[in-house]
Curated annotation (Swiss-Prot):
Originating species: Escherichia coli (strain K12)
Annotated function: Required for the activity of the bacterial periplasmic transport system of putrescine and spermidine. Polyamine binding protein.
Gene3D superfamilies: Periplasmic binding protein-like II
Keyword Ribonucleoprotein: no
Keyword terms of this UniProt record: Periplasm, Signal, Transport
Protein name: Spermidine/putrescine-binding periplasmic protein
Matching NCBIfam families: PRK09501.1
Amino acid sequence: MKKWSRHLLAAGALALGMSAAHADDNNTLYFYNWTEYVPPGLLEQFTKETGIKVIYSTYESNETMYAKLKTYKDGAYDLVVPSTYYVDKMRKEGMIQKIDKSKLTNFSNLDPDMLNKPFDPNNDYSIPYIWGATAIGVNGDAVDPKSVTSWADLWKPEYKGSLLLTDDAREVFQMALRKLGYSGNTTDPKEIEAAYNELKKLMPNVAAFNSDNPANPYMEGEVNLGMIWNGSAFVARQAGTPIDVVWPKEGGIFWMDSLAIPANAKNKEGALKLINFLLRPDVAKQVAETIGYPTPNLAARKLLSPEVANDKTLYPDAETIKNGEWQNDVGAASSIYEEYYQKLKAGR
């Protein structure tokens, strides 16, 4: 998931303090999730149905979640929601445990096309919760969407000082790497450097970086073109801002937020029950409608309104997904990306 607003940070920190005192209690479950990622009343519904009380705390980046799990090694959390390549990183480091899918009676509701991704083959360690993509956002009132077909178009001089980029090193570099014909998951220092040099050429066109909610600058009229998350664009359209999503010919950037059980979780059985609850069609529908991002749950998608379920910006066709690329862990190369990214922003 991508970072949203920061107004829940203090609440998340308070809940974190409670979770540090995690008791070995099968009637209590400690759930650490992204902000604004669970509909109001949903966890209370789970408690009513199962008798398991959920202590809920939130984070706004994978880095924060990862650091907390590294810090609290006594089993502070029972369920977490890492994104794409963090699933890969955490399973390789032994931070999350294998999931007994035989206890997930609702697992069959998931779209087979959303399973068995490179970051977790066979979904041994993670269960899809929400997915999304980064593509090109276009304010149709200001820019003809048909005039933009590729990431490369963002480099045109006519867009000087008018673009928005997400404030995410991997995403920004993945865009440039795809433009150059490389994998967005490359670990080759020369290819990453080439992307950095390509991005330096783009900087005169960049007006802002935003990963709190990249639709906001479009809605405020600050930008009319740039990177966008498809769910963020959908929410903006619902609010009246005409943001079109263009799937670049070089391919979109796909990510998934998945449910995972920490290796030292104290209430594994409770975590499995909550995962199974969240896989229920009626529940997954609530989640998708609340946060505005696509659900990987086919049974839930059938319950959505046709307007939403058939929206190709939310649910692109198989060819569009195949042409894109899922983010994966790049290991030690992540520091190379971050170093170049900071240089890029400092040199604006």
